[in-house]
């Protein structure tokens, strides 16, 4: 089975569903991760297209380009830890995806779906403080609209700690819980591959917080550790 994970930034895939990804690959499913935005915070002029439009001198631009290269290396390392070898980067501007037309973002996702033919698509929750996450949810829902020739049977959204929980007043309401007790340490190891993204507790992107979140969802679902998801669409040929 082909599983497509569409995220805005490098590390979102680990924070949201690193344990579940590992569970899929352990069970011999194929997982593809698509990173839509750069993950390098945008201090750029409007209508950003590439590094030349940064409002910085050449040295600073070069440093940011090197940082982006390092971030992509970290992403591939994290993916490998989770058992994933297929990672694609789209390089949309970070925290500015609302400046890109929904059609352009949707078409990028549609092309990936056309070639990869996933059975399940995961993406961000609609209820998220990060604008890139919200844009991606909308684009993914459009790209996965059910048609007779579409391979997708399920569309599922996930939370990203340090982003989803800060959205108000509507909130992420999970109805799927995946047991990651055996995969939690792998998730932590994959997160630590992002050497510049880890924070100290009590930040939600700290190692301790990731453990707490997994344990918390476990208490909700009768498990020792879990990742939480919200089912967006489930097309089934058999009765529930």
What do these predicted ranges mean?
Residues 91-93, 123-126, 159-160:
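Short, well-ordered beta-to-alpha junction loops that form the rim of enzyme active sites
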Residues 106-154:
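Active-site adenylate/phosphate-handling loop in enzymes that bind or generate adenylated species
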Residues 19-23, 74-77, 104, 108, ...:
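Alpha-helical elements of Rossmann-like donor-binding domains used by nucleotide-donor carbohydrate transfer enzymes
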Residues 1-116, 146, 230:
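Active-site rim/loop-helix segments in enzyme catalytic domains that contact anionic ligands
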Residues 44-46, 99-101, 133-134, 166-169, ...:
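Short, well-ordered secondary-structure micro-motifs
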Residues 1-2, 54-56, 74, 78-82, ...:
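The feature marks non-catalytic terminal segments
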Residues 38-40, 94-96, 128, 162-164, ...:
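Residue-level detector of flexible, active-site-proximal loop/helix-junction positions
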């Amino acid at each position: 089975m082909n599983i497509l994970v569409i995220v805005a930034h490098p590390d979102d895939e680990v924070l949201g569903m690193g344990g579940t990804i590992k569970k899929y690959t352990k069970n011999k499913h194929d997982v593809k991760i698509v990173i839509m935005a750069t993950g390098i915070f945008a201090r750029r002029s409007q209508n950003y297209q590439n590094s030349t439009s940064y409002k910085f001198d050449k040295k600073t631009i070069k440093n940011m380009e090197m940082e982006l290269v390092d971030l992509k290396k970290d992403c591939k390392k994290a993916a490998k830890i989770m058992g994933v070898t297929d990672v694609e980067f789209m390089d949309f501007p970070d925290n500015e995806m609302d400046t890109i037309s929904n059609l352009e973002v949707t078409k990028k996702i549609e092309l990936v779906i056309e070639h990869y033919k996933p059975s399940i698509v995961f993406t961000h929750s609609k209820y998220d403080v990060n604008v890139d996450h919200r844009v991606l949810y909308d684009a993914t829902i459009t790209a996965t609209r059910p048609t007779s020739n579409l391979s997708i049977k399920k569309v599922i959204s996930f939370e990203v700690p340090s982003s989803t929980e800060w959205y108000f007043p509507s909130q992420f309401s999970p109805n799927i819980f995946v047991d990651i007790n055996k995969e939690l340490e792998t998730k932590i190891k994959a997160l630590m591959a992002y050497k510049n993204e880890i924070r100290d507790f009590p930040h939600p992107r700290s190692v301790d917080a990731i453990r707490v979140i997994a344990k918390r969802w476990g208490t909700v679902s009768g498990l020792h550790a879990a990742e939480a998801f919200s089912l967006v669409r489930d097309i089934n040929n058999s009765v529930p």
